[in-house]
Amino acid sequence: MIIIPKQTDIFIVGGGSAGLAGAIALRARGFGVTVADPALPPIDKTCGEGLMPDALASLGRLGVTLRPEHFFPFRGFRFVSGRASVDASFPNGTGAGIRRTHLHEALIDRAQETGATLLWGVPVKGLTKTGVTLDGGTVECRWVVGADGENSRVRRWAGLESARSKSLRFGFRRHYRITPWTDCVEIYWGSGCQIYVTPIGHEEMCVVVMSRDSHLRLDQALPMFPELFGRLKNAAWTSTERGAVSATRRLARVYSGHVLLVGDASGSVDAITGEGLRLCFEQSLALAKALSDDNLKAYAAAHRQLARRPAFMAALMLSLDHSAWLRQRVLRALSSEPRIFATQVAMHVGAATTTDFIRRSMLPLGRHILAA
Protein backbone atom coordinates (compact mmCIF):
# COMPACT_ATOMS: atom_id res chain seq x y z
CA MET A 1 0.00 0.00 0.00
CA ILE A 2 1.33 3.43 -0.99
CA ILE A 3 1.19 5.99 1.81
CA ILE A 4 1.12 9.51 0.39
CA PRO A 5 2.17 12.29 2.77
CA LYS A 6 -0.05 15.33 3.18
CA GLN A 7 2.89 17.70 3.38
CA THR A 8 6.60 17.83 2.51
CA ASP A 9 9.22 20.55 2.15
CA ILE A 10 10.01 19.71 -1.47
CA PHE A 11 8.03 17.60 -3.93
CA ILE A 12 10.00 16.23 -6.89
CA VAL A 13 8.04 15.25 -9.99
CA GLY A 14 10.00 12.49 -11.73
CA GLY A 15 11.96 9.62 -10.24
CA GLY A 16 14.63 9.17 -12.88
CA SER A 17 18.30 10.03 -12.44
CA ALA A 18 17.69 13.78 -12.06
CA GLY A 19 14.83 13.38 -9.60
CA LEU A 20 16.69 10.91 -7.40
CA ALA A 21 19.91 12.94 -7.50
CA GLY A 22 17.88 15.99 -6.49
CA ALA A 23 16.29 14.08 -3.62
CA ILE A 24 19.69 12.90 -2.36
CA ALA A 25 21.23 16.38 -2.52
CA LEU A 26 18.23 18.04 -0.86
CA ARG A 27 18.05 15.49 1.94
CA ALA A 28 21.72 16.19 2.65
CA ARG A 29 20.69 19.81 3.25
CA GLY A 30 18.00 18.76 5.71
CA PHE A 31 14.89 19.16 3.57
CA GLY A 32 11.97 16.77 3.71
CA VAL A 33 11.64 15.34 0.19
CA THR A 34 8.97 13.34 -1.62
CA VAL A 35 9.53 11.95 -5.13
CA ALA A 36 6.74 10.65 -7.38
CA ASP A 37 6.92 8.87 -10.73
CA PRO A 38 4.20 7.06 -12.71
CA ALA A 39 6.63 4.27 -13.66
CA LEU A 40 7.87 1.37 -11.58
CA PRO A 41 11.61 0.92 -10.94
CA PRO A 42 14.11 0.30 -12.27
CA ILE A 43 13.48 2.94 -14.93
CA ASP A 44 15.31 2.50 -18.23
CA LYS A 45 16.20 5.21 -20.72
CA THR A 46 17.96 5.09 -24.06
CA CYS A 47 21.46 6.50 -23.68
CA GLY A 48 25.07 5.58 -24.36
CA GLU A 49 25.43 4.30 -20.78
CA GLY A 50 28.88 5.75 -20.23
CA LEU A 51 29.79 7.80 -17.15
CA MET A 52 32.89 9.96 -17.61
CA PRO A 53 35.34 10.49 -14.71
CA ASP A 54 33.78 13.84 -13.80
CA ALA A 55 30.31 12.24 -13.70
CA LEU A 56 31.64 9.56 -11.35
CA ALA A 57 33.11 12.30 -9.16
CA SER A 58 29.68 13.96 -9.03
CA LEU A 59 28.10 10.65 -8.04
CA GLY A 60 30.67 10.40 -5.26
CA ARG A 61 29.65 13.81 -3.93
CA LEU A 62 26.09 12.49 -3.77
CA GLY A 63 27.29 9.47 -1.82
CA VAL A 64 26.22 7.01 -4.52
CA THR A 65 28.16 3.74 -4.73
CA LEU A 66 28.18 1.58 -7.86
CA ARG A 67 28.52 -2.16 -7.36
CA PRO A 68 31.69 -3.42 -9.14
CA GLU A 69 29.82 -6.24 -10.87
CA HIS A 70 27.43 -3.70 -12.42
CA PHE A 71 29.90 -1.60 -14.41
CA PHE A 72 32.87 -1.89 -16.76
CA PRO A 73 35.74 0.63 -16.55
CA PHE A 74 36.91 2.38 -19.70
CA ARG A 75 39.96 4.59 -20.10
CA GLY A 76 38.94 7.13 -22.73
CA PHE A 77 37.49 7.82 -26.19
CA ARG A 78 38.22 6.41 -29.62
CA PHE A 79 36.98 8.09 -32.82
CA VAL A 80 36.77 6.00 -35.99
CA SER A 81 36.00 7.29 -39.48
CA GLY A 82 36.77 5.01 -42.41
CA ARG A 83 40.42 3.99 -42.12
CA ALA A 84 41.27 6.81 -39.72
CA SER A 85 41.11 6.30 -35.97
CA VAL A 86 42.47 8.02 -32.89
CA ASP A 87 42.12 7.40 -29.18
CA ALA A 88 43.07 9.13 -25.95
CA SER A 89 42.85 8.32 -22.26
CA PHE A 90 41.15 10.50 -19.68
CA PRO A 91 43.74 12.46 -17.69
CA ASN A 92 41.63 12.33 -14.51
CA GLY A 93 40.73 8.67 -13.98
CA THR A 94 38.54 6.11 -15.69
CA GLY A 95 34.94 6.14 -16.79
CA ALA A 96 32.29 3.49 -16.16
CA GLY A 97 29.98 1.78 -18.62
CA ILE A 98 26.82 0.78 -16.76
CA ARG A 99 23.32 -0.28 -17.69
CA ARG A 100 20.90 2.56 -17.02
CA THR A 101 18.78 0.25 -14.87
CA HIS A 102 21.75 -0.57 -12.61
CA LEU A 103 22.49 3.14 -12.20
CA HIS A 104 18.85 3.77 -11.32
CA GLU A 105 18.95 1.05 -8.67
CA ALA A 106 22.08 2.61 -7.12
CA LEU A 107 20.39 6.02 -6.99
CA ILE A 108 17.28 4.50 -5.40
CA ASP A 109 19.39 2.79 -2.74
CA ARG A 110 21.10 6.07 -1.85
CA ALA A 111 17.84 8.08 -1.87
CA GLN A 112 16.27 5.57 0.51
CA GLU A 113 19.33 5.72 2.77
CA THR A 114 18.90 9.49 3.06
CA GLY A 115 15.25 9.15 4.09
CA ALA A 116 13.55 10.48 0.95
CA THR A 117 9.97 9.31 0.38
CA LEU A 118 9.69 7.55 -3.00
CA LEU A 119 6.26 7.07 -4.58
CA TRP A 120 6.35 4.66 -7.54
CA GLY A 121 3.40 4.19 -9.88
CA VAL A 122 2.02 7.56 -8.76
CA PRO A 123 1.39 10.15 -11.51
CA VAL A 124 1.24 13.85 -10.69
CA LYS A 125 -1.85 15.46 -12.20
CA GLY A 126 -1.02 19.13 -11.83
CA LEU A 127 0.30 22.00 -9.75
CA THR A 128 -1.43 24.19 -7.21
CA LYS A 129 -0.27 27.42 -5.59
CA THR A 130 0.81 25.43 -2.55
CA GLY A 131 1.74 22.01 -3.88
CA VAL A 132 0.81 19.26 -6.34
CA THR A 133 -2.29 17.22 -7.09
CA LEU A 134 -2.32 13.42 -7.25
CA ASP A 135 -5.12 10.94 -7.77
CA GLY A 136 -5.45 10.66 -4.01
CA GLY A 137 -5.57 14.39 -3.32
CA THR A 138 -3.16 17.28 -2.79
CA VAL A 139 0.30 17.30 -1.24
CA GLU A 140 1.31 20.64 0.26
CA CYS A 141 4.91 21.74 -0.18
CA ARG A 142 7.12 24.80 -0.24
CA TRP A 143 8.88 23.94 -3.50
CA VAL A 144 8.09 21.79 -6.54
CA VAL A 145 11.00 20.44 -8.59
CA GLY A 146 10.29 19.32 -12.15
CA ALA A 147 12.60 16.40 -12.97
CA ASP A 148 10.25 14.79 -15.47
CA GLY A 149 12.49 14.77 -18.51
CA GLU A 150 12.65 16.22 -21.98
CA ASN A 151 8.87 16.41 -22.43
CA SER A 152 8.33 17.90 -18.98
CA ARG A 153 4.75 18.58 -17.99
CA VAL A 154 5.96 20.59 -15.00
CA ARG A 155 7.85 22.89 -17.37
CA ARG A 156 4.66 23.41 -19.35
CA TRP A 157 2.45 23.89 -16.28
CA ALA A 158 4.86 26.49 -14.87
CA GLY A 159 5.06 28.47 -18.12
CA LEU A 160 8.77 27.78 -18.59
CA GLU A 161 8.52 26.35 -22.11
CA SER A 162 10.16 29.28 -23.90
CA ALA A 163 13.44 27.97 -25.34
CA ARG A 164 16.36 30.02 -26.63
CA SER A 165 17.41 27.25 -28.98
CA LYS A 166 16.35 23.75 -29.87
CA SER A 167 17.38 20.97 -32.24
CA LEU A 168 16.52 17.29 -32.35
CA ARG A 169 18.32 14.06 -33.15
CA PHE A 170 17.15 10.49 -32.75
CA GLY A 171 18.85 7.60 -31.00
CA PHE A 172 18.22 3.84 -31.00
CA ARG A 173 19.96 1.50 -28.58
CA ARG A 174 20.50 -2.24 -28.33
CA HIS A 175 22.67 -4.40 -26.05
CA TYR A 176 24.82 -7.26 -27.35
CA ARG A 177 26.30 -10.25 -25.55
CA ILE A 178 29.94 -10.02 -26.57
CA THR A 179 33.30 -9.71 -24.83
CA PRO A 180 34.45 -6.08 -25.13
CA TRP A 181 37.22 -5.66 -27.69
CA THR A 182 37.95 -2.12 -26.51
CA ASP A 183 38.73 -0.26 -23.31
CA CYS A 184 37.29 2.98 -24.73
CA VAL A 185 33.94 4.43 -25.64
CA GLU A 186 34.09 4.25 -29.43
CA ILE A 187 32.34 6.70 -31.74
CA TYR A 188 32.06 5.61 -35.37
CA TRP A 189 31.50 8.53 -37.72
CA GLY A 190 29.54 8.00 -40.92
CA SER A 191 27.48 9.90 -43.44
CA GLY A 192 24.59 11.40 -41.52
CA CYS A 193 24.96 9.27 -38.39
CA GLN A 194 27.24 8.09 -35.63
CA ILE A 195 27.33 4.83 -33.72
CA TYR A 196 28.44 4.87 -30.08
CA VAL A 197 29.81 1.68 -28.54
CA THR A 198 30.27 1.39 -24.78
CA PRO A 199 31.55 -1.66 -22.87
CA ILE A 200 29.16 -2.13 -19.94
CA GLY A 201 30.15 -5.59 -18.67
CA HIS A 202 32.62 -8.41 -19.18
CA GLU A 203 30.22 -9.97 -21.69
CA GLU A 204 28.07 -7.03 -22.81
CA MET A 205 28.27 -3.94 -25.03
CA CYS A 206 25.85 -1.04 -25.47
CA VAL A 207 25.43 0.13 -29.08
CA VAL A 208 23.55 3.30 -30.07
CA VAL A 209 22.95 4.92 -33.45
CA MET A 210 22.35 8.69 -33.52
CA SER A 211 21.12 10.68 -36.50
CA ARG A 212 18.67 13.33 -37.63
CA ASP A 213 16.64 10.62 -39.38
CA SER A 214 13.89 9.31 -37.09
CA HIS A 215 13.59 6.18 -39.25
CA LEU A 216 17.25 5.09 -39.17
CA ARG A 217 17.67 1.97 -37.04
CA LEU A 218 20.71 -0.08 -36.08
CA ASP A 219 19.97 -2.78 -38.63
CA GLN A 220 20.24 -0.19 -41.41
CA ALA A 221 23.14 1.76 -39.89
CA LEU A 222 25.55 -1.01 -38.88
CA PRO A 223 26.37 -2.19 -42.44
CA MET A 224 27.69 1.34 -43.10
CA PHE A 225 30.55 0.44 -40.72
CA PRO A 226 31.95 -2.90 -41.98
CA GLU A 227 34.47 -3.46 -39.19
CA LEU A 228 31.91 -2.88 -36.44
CA PHE A 229 29.23 -4.81 -38.31
CA GLY A 230 31.60 -7.78 -38.59
CA ARG A 231 32.15 -7.80 -34.83
CA LEU A 232 28.46 -7.66 -33.96
CA LYS A 233 26.66 -9.61 -36.68
CA ASN A 234 26.85 -12.96 -34.83
CA ALA A 235 26.46 -11.57 -31.30
CA ALA A 236 23.22 -12.30 -29.46
CA TRP A 237 21.01 -9.40 -28.43
CA THR A 238 20.47 -8.93 -24.71
CA SER A 239 17.80 -6.27 -25.18
CA THR A 240 15.36 -5.14 -27.82
CA GLU A 241 15.98 -1.94 -29.73
CA ARG A 242 14.77 1.11 -27.82
CA GLY A 243 14.56 4.68 -29.12
CA ALA A 244 14.66 8.21 -27.74
CA VAL A 245 14.94 11.81 -28.85
CA SER A 246 18.14 13.70 -28.09
CA ALA A 247 17.39 17.40 -27.87
CA THR A 248 19.61 20.43 -27.66
CA ARG A 249 17.48 22.88 -25.70
CA ARG A 250 18.32 26.04 -23.77
CA LEU A 251 15.57 27.56 -21.66
CA ALA A 252 15.23 31.24 -20.93
CA ARG A 253 14.43 30.44 -17.27
CA VAL A 254 14.76 27.40 -15.01
CA TYR A 255 12.46 28.53 -12.22
CA SER A 256 9.21 30.43 -11.76
CA GLY A 257 7.60 31.13 -8.42
CA HIS A 258 7.85 27.99 -6.29
CA VAL A 259 8.67 25.71 -9.26
CA LEU A 260 12.21 24.78 -10.34
CA LEU A 261 13.51 22.51 -13.09
CA VAL A 262 16.42 20.08 -13.07
CA GLY A 263 17.88 17.57 -15.52
CA ASP A 264 16.52 17.33 -19.06
CA ALA A 265 13.38 19.19 -17.97
CA SER A 266 15.63 22.24 -17.48
CA GLY A 267 17.32 22.01 -20.88
CA SER A 268 19.64 19.52 -22.50
CA VAL A 269 22.69 19.00 -24.69
CA ASP A 270 23.09 16.53 -27.54
CA ALA A 271 23.83 12.97 -26.46
CA ILE A 272 27.10 13.04 -28.42
CA THR A 273 28.74 14.68 -25.39
CA GLY A 274 27.75 11.94 -22.92
CA GLU A 275 27.26 14.78 -20.43
CA GLY A 276 23.55 14.50 -19.61
CA LEU A 277 23.97 12.51 -16.41
CA ARG A 278 26.83 14.59 -15.06
CA LEU A 279 24.81 17.72 -15.71
CA CYS A 280 21.80 16.44 -13.78
CA PHE A 281 24.02 15.39 -10.85
CA GLU A 282 25.77 18.77 -10.70
CA GLN A 283 22.52 20.68 -11.20
CA SER A 284 21.01 18.77 -8.28
CA LEU A 285 23.88 19.75 -6.00
CA ALA A 286 23.59 23.39 -7.11
CA LEU A 287 19.81 23.32 -6.64
CA ALA A 288 20.11 21.99 -3.10
CA LYS A 289 22.64 24.67 -2.15
CA ALA A 290 20.52 27.44 -3.66
CA LEU A 291 17.37 26.34 -1.82
CA SER A 292 19.34 25.98 1.41
CA ASP A 293 20.60 29.55 0.92
CA ASP A 294 17.14 30.71 -0.27
CA ASN A 295 18.80 32.10 -3.41
CA LEU A 296 17.15 30.93 -6.63
CA LYS A 297 19.20 33.37 -8.71
CA ALA A 298 22.30 31.45 -7.64
CA TYR A 299 20.78 28.26 -9.05
CA ALA A 300 20.02 29.95 -12.38
CA ALA A 301 23.60 31.26 -12.57
CA ALA A 302 25.09 27.87 -11.67
CA HIS A 303 22.84 26.17 -14.22
CA ARG A 304 24.08 28.47 -17.00
CA GLN A 305 27.70 27.94 -15.99
CA LEU A 306 27.35 24.15 -15.90
CA ALA A 307 25.88 24.10 -19.42
CA ARG A 308 28.63 26.12 -21.12
CA ARG A 309 31.33 23.49 -21.59
CA PRO A 310 28.97 20.68 -22.73
CA ALA A 311 27.23 23.06 -25.15
CA PHE A 312 30.57 24.12 -26.61
CA MET A 313 31.80 20.54 -26.97
CA ALA A 314 28.49 19.46 -28.53
CA ALA A 315 28.70 22.23 -31.13
CA LEU A 316 32.30 21.30 -31.89
CA MET A 317 31.59 17.59 -32.28
CA LEU A 318 28.40 18.08 -34.28
CA SER A 319 30.27 20.27 -36.76
CA LEU A 320 31.83 16.99 -37.91
CA ASP A 321 28.36 15.58 -38.51
CA HIS A 322 27.46 18.43 -40.86
CA SER A 323 30.43 18.14 -43.23
CA ALA A 324 32.06 14.97 -44.56
CA TRP A 325 34.89 17.11 -45.95
CA LEU A 326 35.65 18.59 -42.52
CA ARG A 327 35.17 15.26 -40.73
CA GLN A 328 37.72 13.43 -42.89
CA ARG A 329 40.32 16.17 -42.55
CA VAL A 330 39.84 16.48 -38.80
CA LEU A 331 40.06 12.71 -38.23
CA ARG A 332 43.18 12.44 -40.40
CA ALA A 333 44.76 15.33 -38.52
CA LEU A 334 43.91 13.83 -35.14
CA SER A 335 45.26 10.44 -36.23
CA SER A 336 48.57 11.98 -37.23
CA GLU A 337 48.78 14.13 -34.08
CA PRO A 338 47.17 12.22 -31.16
CA ARG A 339 48.22 14.89 -28.64
CA ILE A 340 45.62 17.21 -30.15
CA PHE A 341 42.90 14.65 -29.47
CA ALA A 342 44.21 14.09 -25.95
CA THR A 343 43.71 17.79 -25.22
CA GLN A 344 40.18 17.61 -26.62
CA VAL A 345 39.38 14.66 -24.36
CA ALA A 346 40.83 16.52 -21.38
CA MET A 347 38.63 19.52 -22.17
CA HIS A 348 35.62 17.25 -22.54
CA VAL A 349 35.95 15.99 -18.95
CA GLY A 350 36.88 19.33 -17.43
CA ALA A 351 40.59 18.59 -17.05
CA ALA A 352 41.84 21.32 -19.42
CA THR A 353 41.21 25.05 -19.47
CA THR A 354 39.78 26.90 -22.45
CA THR A 355 43.19 28.52 -22.98
CA ASP A 356 44.88 25.10 -23.04
CA PHE A 357 42.24 23.83 -25.43
CA ILE A 358 42.73 26.68 -27.89
CA ARG A 359 46.54 26.63 -27.70
CA ARG A 360 47.10 22.86 -27.70
CA SER A 361 44.16 21.70 -29.79
CA MET A 362 42.30 24.23 -31.91
CA LEU A 363 45.31 26.12 -33.28
CA PRO A 364 47.36 22.99 -34.17
CA LEU A 365 44.26 21.34 -35.61
CA GLY A 366 43.55 24.37 -37.78
CA ARG A 367 47.10 24.30 -39.12
CA HIS A 368 46.80 20.59 -39.97
CA ILE A 369 43.50 21.10 -41.81
CA LEU A 370 44.83 24.04 -43.82
CA ALA A 371 47.95 22.09 -44.74
CA ALA A 372 45.97 19.01 -45.85
Give the positions of each predicted feature:
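A conserved beta-strand/loop capping segment in the N-terminal third of enzymes
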Residues: L56-A106
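C-terminal helical "tail/cap" subdomain of flavin- and related membrane-associated enzymes
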Residues: K289-A372
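Conserved Rossmann-like nucleotide-cofactor binding loop
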Residues: A18, P41, N151
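Glycine-rich FAD pyrophosphate-binding loop
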Residues: F11-V13, I24-C47
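Conserved N-terminal glycine-rich FAD pyrophosphate-binding loop of Rossmann-like flavoproteins
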Residues: A39-L62, F74
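Predominantly flavin-linked oxidoreductase catalytic cores and closely associated redox partners
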Residues: R110-N234
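FAD/FMN-dependent oxidoreductases across multiple families
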Residues: D213-K289, K297
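Beta1/beta-strand and adjacent pyrophosphate-binding region of the FAD-binding site
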Residues: I2-A18
